[in-house]
Design a protein with these regions (language model features):
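Active-site-proximal beta-alpha core segment in soluble small-molecule metabolic enzymes
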Residues: 2, 7-8, 12-15, 22-23, ...
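C-terminal helical cap(s) of enzyme catalytic domains, especially alpha/beta-barrels
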Residues: 18, 75-80, 239-246
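Solvent-exposed alpha-helices and their adjacent loops that cap or buttress functional pockets
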Residues: 32, 100, 123-125, 132, ...
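Flexible, glycine/charged-enriched surface loops at secondary-structure junctions
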Residues: 35, 202-205, 347-354
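A structural signal for short, hydrophobic beta-strand segments that form beta-sheets
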Residues: 88, 164, 256, 312-313
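Catalytic metal-binding/acid-base residues of hydrolase active sites
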Residues: 138, 172, 212, 230, ...
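Anionic-ligand-binding alpha/beta catalytic cores of soluble enzymes and soluble regulatory domains
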Residues: 178-280
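C-terminal accessory subdomain/extension
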Residues: 261-378
Length: 378
């Protein structure tokens, strides 16, 4: 963790508010039945925020489980000393069965080849190893088709050393104000779990809800809510009227690397896509698509300088972006620039950047490059 006093040495950095992470977990948890747990989703480096630090903050705030997408992500948590229950949501290939068992990570099993490899390693270690089974109820990605579930789970029972602890699915449209398809998926999921019970197969943990369903559809909560984007203070959808106030955890900052006045007729950036119509004060921000700032923000995005919005002019390049600071008083070399987040009373949200980049807020934070230091505020 980097001491905040050393920030003067950075050109571009992200500040991660761990108190915001904790507050968001607690705000959602308060809305859940006491019997419902929280699974904090820290895949993709915790949506760009830093998996180890976010995992610790979420667990301290009351999350009972962690979720990742790849086995390597779970191993990294273990190597950092985090021993909380951790589910791999994505595909676990047979070749990684040893890693999963040895690090006590819970896999989502969707093939018998993986199950066989897990069982073999569990037997070698003389252990009973727990797994979860994923059902595709309408997402059309990873998971068993509903009609395959009973036979597949029955086949899993033939593998000595494996215990099926959980069955889960994922909602495709929980972020849509119209809940009809989510409820259709819920019905498919319930049909599967009832068929398993009728076959004499008891699975103790059921989970279906993501952030949007966790906040909007209590009938989907079951035993666990998988808290992803909302934990980071981002709305699952700008179309939803959320029942809790979320606090964004990430602020992306840079600083004025050069300040000058371009004469009328001078161009900025690759392709000369901006030509100054009049003398224009330009601040150079040392941030670009190499840091994760979208090139689609060229000539349309904005950043905050001295609490005011400054327009992006010219093409966003790999390492630098130019801003029109005409009309903003007292801008100086090395002044702080907020790419997204708050500066004084002003704010540019990840949703704003997503709108300019024609994408979603999830992508804006997740794409933040590894070369951008994360500074953790506690």
């Amino acid at each position: 963790m980097i001491d905040n006093k050393s920030l003067n040495g950075y050109l571009t950095w992200a500040e991660i508010d761990l108190k915001a992470i904790a507050r968001n977990v607690q705000a959602v948890k308060k809305r859940l039945d006491p019997t419902v747990g929280v699974m904090a989703v820290v895949k993709a480096n915790a949506y760009g925020h830093g998996a180890v630090e976010v995992a610790r903050a979420a667990l301290a705030a009351g999350a009972e489980w962690l979720a990742v997408n790849r086995v390597e992500e779970g191993v990294a948590l273990r190597q950092a000393g985090i021993e909380a229950r951790t589910l791999v949501l994505g595909y676990c290939p047979p070749g990684q069965a040893g890693l999963v068992v040895e690090h006590n990570i819970t896999p989502a099993v969707t093939t018998l080849d993986t199950a066989e490899a897990l069982a073999e390693r569990a037997q070698q270690l003389d252990r009973e190893f727990v797994i979860h089974v994923k059902i595709d109820t309408g997402m059309g990605r990873l998971g068993l088709l509903p009609e395959e579930a009973v036979d597949f789970v029955g086949a899993l029972a033939e593998f000595s050393g494996l215990k099926i602890e959980g069955v889960f699915s994922h909602l495709a449209t929980a972020d849509d104000p119209d809940p009809s398809f989510s409820r259709r998926q819920l019905q498919v999921y319930q049909d599967v779990t009832q068929a398993l019970e009728a076959a004499g197969i008891e699975i103790p943990l059921h989970h279906l809800a993501n952030s949007a369903a966790g906040l909007q559809l209590p009938e989907t909560h079951h035993h666990l809510v998988r808290l992803g984007v909302a934990m980071y203070g981002l709305t699952p959808s700008i179309k939803l009227d959320l029942p809790v106030e979320l606090r964004p955890a990430m602020t992306l900052k840079t600083r004025v690397a050069r300040l000058r006045v371009l004469p009328a007729g001078a161009a900025v950036g690759y392709g000369r896509t901006f030509v100054a119509p009049e003398p224009t004060a330009v601040a150079l921000a040392p941030v670009g698509y190499g840091d994760g700032y979208p090139r689609l923000c060229s000539n349309r995005g904005e950043m905050l300088v001295r609490g005011q919005r400054a327009r992006v002019i010219g093409a966003v390049s790999m390492d630098q972006t130019s801003l029109d600071v005409s009309g903003i008083d007292d801008v100086s070399q090395d002044d702080e620039i907020v790419v997204f987040g708050r500066q004084g009373e002003a704010e540019i949200s990840a949703e704003d950047v997503a709108r300019w980049a024609e994408t979603i807020n999830y992508e804006i934070v997740t794409r933040l490059a590894a070369r951008v230091p994360r500074i953790y505020l506690e």
